[in-house]
Amino acid sequence: MRTLLLLLFGSLALAAGSCAAAEAPIATAEPKPLPELRFLDMAGVETGMEAFRGEVVVLNLWATWCAPCKEEMPALDRLAAAFEGRPVRVLALSVDRAPPERVQAFLDEVGVERLAVYRDPKAAATRALKVQGLPVTLLVDREGREAGRVVGIARWDGEEAFAAVRELLAAPGGGPRPLGMIQTGS
């Protein structure tokens, strides 16, 4: 019985640590180069971050099994809507092994419509970016450099997030001005 309880507790602790549910702020510094990231669109065609050069990118790493990710998705969708028609892309990169049908079912359930959805079934992006929990969202400038990172849930439909994206849009050549602070929260 004790072994069973220890196994159960260990499994729960592991699962809790795999999704970053705590609210945390982020401070950004000078933009830094991103590692090469390759991923698949929903049709299975490979692409990478170079396809989005010239655009501000909000890159959200998530998984279908991550409850905080599910909670955050609608705000990301509203962020995408707020910048529709501007050179801003909100990319939702699923880093679990779920097939495209399950990823799409998850998105349908959450009710998102404006996110550019991609898959990384081998979770290579999490290793390349040294991600330790989900969700994680990167702000990427027009030159393809990481200009900010939020670990955990953020209010992507709030003024602080809008201001960060507007600042990246206004920066000459996509940077290198630092963004300051983005408060995260649900």
Predicted regions and their residues:
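Positively charged n-region of N-terminal signal peptides that target proteins for export
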Residues: 1-4
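Bacterial N-terminal signal peptides
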Residues: 6-15
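N-terminal "domain-start" segment that seeds a small globular fold
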Residues: 19-49
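Short active-site neighborhood of thiol/selenol oxidoreductases, capturing the structured segment around
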Residues: 49-67
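Alpha/beta-hydrolase fold active-site loops
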Residues: 56-57, 88, 135, 145
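Structural microenvironment flanking redox-active thiols in thiol-disulfide oxidoreductases
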Residues: 70-110, 121-127
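Thiol/disulfide oxidoreductase modules built on the thioredoxin-like
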Residues: 107-113, 120-166
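Non-globular targeting/processing and membrane-anchoring segments
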Residues: 171-186
